[in-house]
Regions:
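Glycine-rich phosphate/pyrophosphate-handling loop used in enzymes and phosphotransfer proteins
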Residues: 1-158
Length: 158
């Protein structure tokens, strides 16, 4: 068992020398433990902190539409921002795994605020059937998968 792990670590290190994993934002090589976005770029992403406010702008969008316990947007979508670049790679670049990674980042940060307390299910925003056919996946569902992986809250796509 130890030999197998050592071989995997060695092979992974060797492949990283030949094909370094790079940050999708700045292009610098990722450190061990970083996933698709380096720590510096992750820290600099424009967070809304809406999860800290009851009655935030995202929740207000749903008032009178559907029964809702909580809603938030974790990042601002600003012209020219690094988050916009990440989102475009997720939506139009076929990099659906970025959604799961971003969902895990988001859930890990929101856990300490008790944002998920009392939440029974995660419902990703549905994507129009034509867009889903073209893209091959729903980016919201991939973000929800990342959130679910950290929180253990099930996803309902029906």
């Amino acid at each position: 068992m130890k030999h197998t792990l050592l071989i995997k670590d060695w092979l992974s290190s060797f492949l990283s020398l030949l094909f370094p994993r790079c940050c999708v934002v700045c292009g610098r090589p990722l450190a061990k433990g970083e996933e698709c976005i380096c720590t510096v770029c992750n820290i600099n992403l424009p967070r809304t902190n809406y999860h800290l406010r009851k009655d935030n702008p995202v929740e207000r969008l749903f008032w009178g539409q559907i029964p809702l316990e909580r809603a938030t947007s974790f990042f601002f979508y600003e012209k020219g921002s690094d988050f916009r670049l990440i989102l475009h790679r997720l939506k139009y670049g076929g990099q659906k795994e970025i959604g799961a990674i971003m969902g895990r980042y988001m859930a890990a940060e929101l856990l300490s605020s008790h944002f998920f307390q009392g939440i029974d299910v995660i419902i990703p925003i549905p994507l129009h059937k034509k867009k889903q056919q073209i893209r091959g996946y729903n980016q919201s569902e991939w973000i929800a998968r990342g959130v679910s992986a950290v929180t253990g809250i099930p996803i309902d796509t029906e």
